[in-house]
Structures are given as C-alpha cells and as structure tokens.
C-alpha cells in the first residue's frame, strides 16, 4: 500500500531517478532557471527547497556536497545562501509553460525567486 509515501518514479529505477534529479538540481543552482516537464519540476522543487534551506547553515557543507553534483562550488552555494537568507521557505517558483510539441507533455519553468530582481510582469505593473 502507498500510504504516506511521496515522490514520483518517472519510470526509472531508484539510482537513475536520483542521478537525474541531482543533475537537474545542479543545473538549477548554476543557471537559476530550467525548463522541464511539469512533473519533474514539481518533484525537483520539493528537493531543492530543502537543499536551499540548508545552504544558510555553514555546518551543512558536508551534507550539501553529498547531495549536489561536483560542479557546484562554494561560491555558488554562498550566492544561493544570500538569496535564501531573508526567507524561511518559498525560494522556488514553478511557471506552467504549455505543452511540448513532440509528445504533448506539460512543460514548466522552475526558477529561483530573487527578491532583488523583478520579473517582467512585476515591472509591467509598476509602469502601468
């Protein structure tokens, strides 16, 4: 029975699924925005919220190195920690994008919310 079990399987084995999410998490932290399917974006958001929350604590460095790909350096983590500092949660946003042409899968943009930068919609509202 599937009681109190969260997470999606994505038709992959556990090690493949973890590797896929680890790579996507690294890309998200480096680029601050990725485009993927809606299901993967929602799953990655759950994982990334916990990881970004841990970047604020300097004693969590060893834990973070085990959960993140090797191409993420300390400078990147400090930049993420500065974004996460004023908040307790809600570091990420999932924006629905439409459907992919090839297989009609629902697509989404997953991005890190930066309080200093304003989105196009917010800047349009201020102009009006």
Model features per residue range: what roles?
Residues 1-12, 16-19, 23-128:
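Structured, basic alpha/beta domains of bacterial-type, RNA-associated proteins
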């Amino acid at each position: 029975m599937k009681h109190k079990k969260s997470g999606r399987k994505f038709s992959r084995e556990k090690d493949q699924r973890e590797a896929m999410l680890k790579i996507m998490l690294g890309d998200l932290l480096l680029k601050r925005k990725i485009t993927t399917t809606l299901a993967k974006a929602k799953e990655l958001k759950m994982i990334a919220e916990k990881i970004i929350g841990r970047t604020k604590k300097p004693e969590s460095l060893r834990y973070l190195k085990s959960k993140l790909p090797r191409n993420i350096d300390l400078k990147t983590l400090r930049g993420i920690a500065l974004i996460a500092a004023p908040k307790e949660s809600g570091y990420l946003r999932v924006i629905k994008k439409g459907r992919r042409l090839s297989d009609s899968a629902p697509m989404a943009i997953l991005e890190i919310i930066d309080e200093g930068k304003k989105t196009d919609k917010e800047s349009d509202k201020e102009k009006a």
